[in-house]
Amino acid sequence: MNVLNIKRVIVVLTMMIASIVSVSAQTAGEYLKITDAVPGGYNFWYFIPEDYKVEQHKMPLVIFLHGASLCGKDLMRVRRYGVLNAIDKGMVIPAFVLAPQNPGGAWSPSKLNDLLEWAKANYNVDSTRVYVLGMSLGGYGTLDFVGSYPEKVAAAMALCGGCSLKDMSGLGKLPLWIMHGTADRAVGVKESKRVVNYLKDNGIDKLLRFDWLEGGNHGVLARLFYLQKTYDWLISHTTNKRKIEDCIDITWDDIKTTYQDMKKMSEDYEHD
């Protein structure tokens, strides 16, 4: 074999290895499509990381609540953007991921709690490390759920949403990060500011972080799902120690360059 052929073989092998590594990174776990598991409840995806399948040790749980554009009865829609889509693109999240689909209307805190209990009953979930992350309609769902069951959630992040609860005092009992763009025309930033002002006015904002992204529109918040810092911040919390992590910052530059750090992701769905 001449030198030229050897070089060609090396190139082909390198490409094959890169392909295997890429596929492995994107499929390092198993997706379960769960329907009718909870009577009258949501259908959902349940992601199981590869290392859990080997060791069966306790793992954190991330609950992802989508926005209005993914509502319906086709579960594949839930993977168009968000946490599961980030995993598909290569994001490594050391946690189970529970991603329900809302058929329409507001998210129900009690139905979400039913899914949380299902996860704890069927998998070795670390109940001290349950996290909730949602955008738009899912941002409302996040605050409504964690405000109703604050003792069950270690930390939450609500993006460009609001809160429907009459009594929002539960939101002051867990680490919470609220983000909203000031140029949001779909859900005005006033919806998030109303929550922040309530917590401040009632002196229960010690576990609160909030950021108003100057000039940010509604869809730009979708980029947070593809940012490693989002998951680092969430998973740094535990219910055993109610203290908010303030050493991890997410800046405008982080958000603007998200798609440069990973592949194009799901820019087409920045309109929820």
Which residues make up each language-model segment?
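Histidine-bearing beta->alpha loop at or near hydrolase active sites
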Residues: 97, 181, 210-220
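Short beta-strand/loop motif that positions the catalytic acidic residue
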Residues: 172, 177-180, 184
